Amino acid sequence: MLVIDSFRGRYRFLSNFSPAIVVYNKNAYPTVEHAYQAAKTLDEDWQEAIFWAKSPTEAKRLGRKVPLREDWEQIKLKVMEDLLRQKFSTFEMKSKLLATGNEHLVEGNTWGDNFWGAVKVKKLRFTYQTYYTWEGKNHLGKLLMKIREEIREDL
């Protein structure tokens, strides 16, 4: 199985930090990350602060501080899916996503996010050979592959 395990370089467009105008709650955000972090709260002051964040990194930092909406755990996957559908709704972005072929998409990371992505873990076989595996739920990768398949089916 072929794997894209880094959303950097030529695959940066897969990252939630890459520029892509998406709308949430009538506001047009510069990245999926901005919109996702704003969606975590119902507090309009926090949403506005995230809207004006100068970078997706700053938006993510602010999102860690917001008072979470009560239903967040139940809706966060749906929110992300909706934002990703917007991001990959243009011809250019659909084409880029389709160009990943059938490769397995893994949001590989070193910061320990095993919900949206996966973390590379060193393992040892009984023969004392070292190998690496990805551990995590990889929800971002799964959503991207789902959307890619739906785009392919619509062709």
What are these regions (language model features)?
Residues M1-L155:
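Charged, low-complexity intrinsically disordered segments
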